[in-house]
Amino acid sequence: MTLTKLPSGAFVRVLEMESKTATILCIDDEQTALQLRQHLLESAGYRVLGAKSGSLGIKTFKSEPIDAVILDYWMADMNGLQVARELRKINSAVPIIILSAYGELLDESLGIADLWIRKGEEDPQYLLNRLEQLLKSKPAH
């Protein structure tokens, strides 16, 4: 495994294994949570880009081909809804999953996020299954 820094400042770990075609952007300012999520997704065969802030996530989203985004709601520089709104302006077709200690918020019904998952209660297999469903329902590039 090698760690590669992208021009946007985000990083990607390259595993020596067959990869699914989807690239997932994970945005979380908690390093441990970000690493655990990256490991889960990489183990499932996804290419994973990690960003340690909302602003870095937006920069990465603009500069890399992204198939889905998983982001934390509560971050220091911007909250998950602010980030999701900016991402939707750039490309509204990319599925967005928000992880939140607050559970589902009203904004989900307004189309900001495709899915809300309560942090601490998330089942890794549930996250992978829902991600796969969202990717399958996504319009082709």
Name each model-derived stretch:
Residues 1-23, 125-141:
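Non-catalytic signal-transmission and effector/linker regions of two-component phosphorelay proteins
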Residues 21-32, 37-41, 69:
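Conserved acidic segment of CheY-like receiver
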Residues 45-52, 60:
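Short hydrophobic/Thr-rich beta-strand motif most characteristic of the beta2 strand and flanking loop
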Residues 52-56, 79-83:
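Acidic catalytic/metal-coordinating carboxylates
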Residues 62-64, 86-93, 111:
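Conserved phosphotransfer cores of two-component systems
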Residues 72:
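Active-site residues of response regulator receiver
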Residues 75:
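Receiver (REC) domain active-site loop signature in two-component systems and cognate sites
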